[in-house]
Amino acid sequence: MDLVQSTINQIGPLDDRAATAARRRQDMLTKPAGSLGRLEELSIRIAGITGRERPRLTNPAVIVMAADHGVARQGVSAFPAEVTPQMVLNFLRGGAAINVLARHVGARVIVVDIGVATDLPPHPDLVSRKLAYGTADFSQEPAMSHETARQAIAVGIACANQAIDSGVDLLATGEMGIANTTAASAVVAAITRRPASEVTGRGTGIDDSGLARKIAVIEQALHRHQPNPDDGLDVLAKVGGLEIGGLAGVILGAAARRVPVVIDGFIAGAAALIAATLAPAATAYMIAGHRSVERGHAAVFSHLDLQPLLDLNMRLGEGTGAVLAMSICQAACKILDEMATFAEAGVSEKV
């Protein structure tokens, strides 16, 4: 049995005992019941994910998958493909938005080259797991073989396992890849069965003619390849991206290890859809970090029945929204763990 299937087989339901105990404790804390709103439900959900009545999330990390896309040759992005390796080097220098926000919340940034179209210089903080020098142009042929798609998911699982083995107890999903909103839009359109025009946005800032071209490219690719909406591996192989597959693996790996995983923006959302088709039980381990302004993101969370924690008009990717949401997850758990109960504080309860 390969790593992907064995990981899927390990994903079970949330721990009802831990969640029930957490809810009972929430109701005994020195506050009116429900007065902390979604923080209370979030802490209870994380208790169910981790199997601990009073979970403590002290070692967060964001895994940033980087890869290139052959479909970029169709003029679907406002930026050239060489920006992908340039931004990876920026991540490694600590100068990108994800680095700043990760430092702010105390999260480690793990950068993975899963498919950048050029060779990157060795760096102690770069995980080199390159499967190909980018995907094929899916407007002309499938983005990758089914075997490569499965390998991409396996890379993500392995990265999640390595992080968790090192003590990470909260994961976030990040990515970098010019033209990856095109691949993500194709994935989302395929799995949610929505028209490409409903789930395709401007990405890095293309104009009206660029948007029309982007939608047309996606529509033609979906018509050409006919991806199976119920088979995330097929969708990934035909119209996805290597970093999208890698993030799907991160999500599956986290779920199998009972570690909460915060979903970032639109590209990470596409990865979450793929993970959910492969292992529906994995959805319970996903925390929707934020709502991107990218057009199809709302469709992702609607399909997964998840409610994002933040709505800040962000559309950068990299894991930026997810990392900010990590601090909310930590705060929710601290409320559950560190607040006194009525009995402990000597405070009278509601009559």
Swiss-Prot record:
One of its GO terms (molecular function) is nicotinate-nucleotide-dimethylbenzimidazole phosphoribosyltransferase activity. This is Nicotinate-nucleotide--dimethylbenzimidazole phosphoribosyltransferase. Belongs to the CobT family. Its EC number is 2.4.2.21. Pathway: Nucleoside biosynthesis; alpha-ribazole biosynthesis; alpha-ribazole from 5,6-dimethylbenzimidazole: step 1/2. It comes from Chloroflexus aurantiacus (strain ATCC 29366 / DSM 635 / J-10-fl). Gene3D superfamilies: 1.10.1610.10, 3.40.50.10210. The keyword Nucleus does not apply. Keywords: Cobalamin biosynthesis, Glycosyltransferase, Transferase.
